[in-house]
């Protein structure tokens, strides 16, 4: 990501409510690549993903009720600097596109896959043209596809929040759909991601505040959940991993983003946020991508880079987090100023 990112100018009401959130983000563990980029003019943004090339971003806009079949959902496309290049790059009701309430997305090669109620749709990421439509079995009532994860081997996984199910899709076999797991313990699976080490599925629960691990054959294990006397999580929405294997989870109701480090320590890296939905991580540019569902905006911000130069016991400075520049290094002897 280039360092001369230009901050979007917010409309007055949003600017007043949003600036304090940015301050909290900066002070709780995120760094700023030049300037944090804010994106406005959205409509109920749900998911924010990056092209693996690091040259483009996409935001899904529900534009109405999350279960409405109104054919007015759209996808916003941004360039490498986070500037909107096409607000309605893909739009329901235009050019025979049927797109009701687009939620989770995943990029695989040239195809942008989008979860839309009871169908998975694939569009060409360059032209925006529809490439494939995948329908799902209706064995479980209340089909509500929520998020998508792409595995390294080419398989896709889709969460179904209403049916407490996870589906596996094989694009190489004509996008065949198989039910991977149907279990009430999923408790409304929302965001899903692939664990970078185990290649297991990780999903977060909307209803019970759980984080669950799912093996390739559908075996469930609870990684984290609320205790009897504690309510750490409420309505978990998004989950993703950075390039070092740290996990990030968003709670849309509590307005928090959590980080779970590789040694299973939890940290709140941002709070008092206005409904952070299905977050994404740009692992190429080390950025967190946050859609703010109820204020119709989104944000790109830098993540802390782990430092191996300091021991765990050594105090870290603001420079380690990127908030202030580090002190200048002494110049070699004989160098003229």
Question: Where does each model-flagged region fall?
Answer:
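Beta-propeller domains
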Residues: 61-83
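Residue position within the beta-strands of beta-propeller blades
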Residues: 58-60, 114, 158, 203, ...
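Short loop/turn segments that connect beta-strands within beta-propeller blades
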Residues: 79-82, 124-128, 170-174, 215-219, ...
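Short glycine/acidic-enriched loop and turn motifs that connect beta-strands
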Residues: 63-67, 119, 163-164, 208-209, ...
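WD40 beta-propeller blade core
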Residues: 76, 121-122, 167, 212, ...
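A short beta-strand motif characteristic of beta-propeller blades
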Residues: 35-38, 85-95, 131-138, 176-182, ...
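Beta-rich, blade/repeat-based domains predominating
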Residues: 42-54, 65, 93-109, 138-156, ...
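Blade-level signature of beta-propeller repeat domains, shared across WD40, Kelch, NHL, RCC1
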Residues: 280-324
């Amino acid at each position: 990501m280039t360092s001369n990112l230009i901050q979007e100018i917010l409309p007055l009401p949003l600017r007043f409510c949003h600036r304090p959130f940015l301050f909290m983000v900066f002070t709780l563990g995120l760094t700023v690549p030049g300037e944090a980029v804010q994106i406005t003019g959205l409509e109920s943004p749900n998911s924010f993903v990056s092209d693996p090339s690091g040259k483009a971003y996409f935001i899904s806009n529900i534009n109405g009720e999350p279960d409405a079949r109104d054919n007015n959902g759209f996808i916003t496309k941004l360039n490498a600097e986070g500037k909107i290049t096409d607000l309605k790059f893909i739009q329901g009701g235009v050019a025979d596109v049927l797109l009701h309430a687009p939620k989770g997305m995943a990029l695989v090669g040239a195809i942008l896959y989008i979860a839309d109620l009871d169908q998975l749709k694939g569009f060409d990421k360059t032209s925006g043209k529809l490439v494939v439509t995948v329908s799902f079995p209706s064995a479980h009532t209340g089909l509500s596809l929520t998020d998508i994860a792409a595995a390294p081997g080419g398989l896709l996984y889709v969460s179904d929040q209403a049916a407490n199910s996870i589906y596996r899709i094989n694009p190489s076999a004509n996008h065949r759909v198989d039910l991977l797991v149907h279990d009430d313990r999923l408790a409304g699976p929302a965001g899903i991601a692939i664990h970078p080490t185990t290649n297991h599925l990780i999903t977060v629960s909307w209803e019970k505040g759980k984080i669950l691990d799912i093996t390739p054959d559908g075996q469930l294990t609870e990684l984290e959940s609320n205790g009897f006397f504690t309510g750490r999580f409420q309505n978990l929405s998004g989950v993703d991993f950075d390039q070092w294997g740290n996990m990030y989870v968003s709670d849309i109701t509590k307005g928090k983003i959590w980080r779970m480090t590789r040694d299973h320590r939890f940290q709140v890296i941002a709070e008092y946020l206005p409904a952070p939905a299905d977050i994404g991580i740009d692992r190429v540019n080390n950025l967190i991508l946050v859609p703010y569902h109820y204020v119709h905006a989104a944000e790109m911000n830098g993540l802390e880079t782990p430092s191996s130069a300091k021991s765990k016991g050594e105090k870290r400075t603001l420079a380690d987090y990127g908030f202030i520049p580090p002190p200048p290094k002494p110049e070699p002897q004989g160098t003229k100023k």
